[in-house]
């Protein structure tokens, strides 16, 4: 349903390591403060506790190859494809009586081609926050679940998000 290349694996919040240093990386992003679903605009909640409140968590990811001439295009496309797939999962869960289902994307929200609205999010019902903005060390969590993320990317870009229900 999501298209070619997607993988999914149910995971446990017990495998999650939350680190201040993961959140600090957001501060050094060139888009810091301009994306309504990224820090410093996220709610101040205990994300570790929140994830443990869910009965089910699953990583959803895709890995897309890129060349020297299409890195930026693949980088953006991979983010949007993952985002839309996670939204489809949320809708499915909503339609099947899971009203608290929520997803977190891989990287910043890129739904708006011209960037975020100046005063508010242009797509408040569809935009999602990056998983790394919660403080989760994604590389460690993925490794604990047998998922290898090569960083920095070398020939392919992997986008990993999370669905919770």
Task: Please identify what each model-predicted range represents.
Residues 1:
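GGW-centered surface loops in extracellular recognition modules
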Residues 4-165:
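Catalytic cores of enzyme domains
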């Amino acid at each position: 349903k999501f298209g070619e290349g997607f993988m999914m694996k149910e995971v446990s919040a017990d495998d999650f390591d939350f680190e201040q240093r993961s959140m600090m990386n957001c501060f050094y992003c060139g888009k810091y403060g301009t994306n309504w679903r990224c820090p410093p605009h996220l709610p101040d909640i205990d994300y570790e506790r929140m994830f443990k409140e869910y009965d089910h968590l699953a990583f959803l990811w895709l890995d897309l190859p890129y060349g020297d001439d299409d890195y930026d295009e693949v980088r953006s496309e991979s983010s949007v494809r993952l985002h839309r797939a996670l939204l489809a999962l949320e809708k499915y869960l909503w339609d099947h009586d899971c009203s608290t289902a929520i997803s977190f994307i891989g990287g910043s929200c890129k739904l708006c081609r011209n960037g975020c609205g100046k005063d508010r999010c242009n797509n408040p019902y569809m935009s999602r926050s990056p998983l790394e903005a919660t403080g989760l060390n994604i590389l460690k969590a993925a490794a604990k679940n047998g998922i290898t993320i090569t960083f920095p990317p070398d020939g392919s870009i992997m986008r990993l998000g999370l669905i919770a229900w």
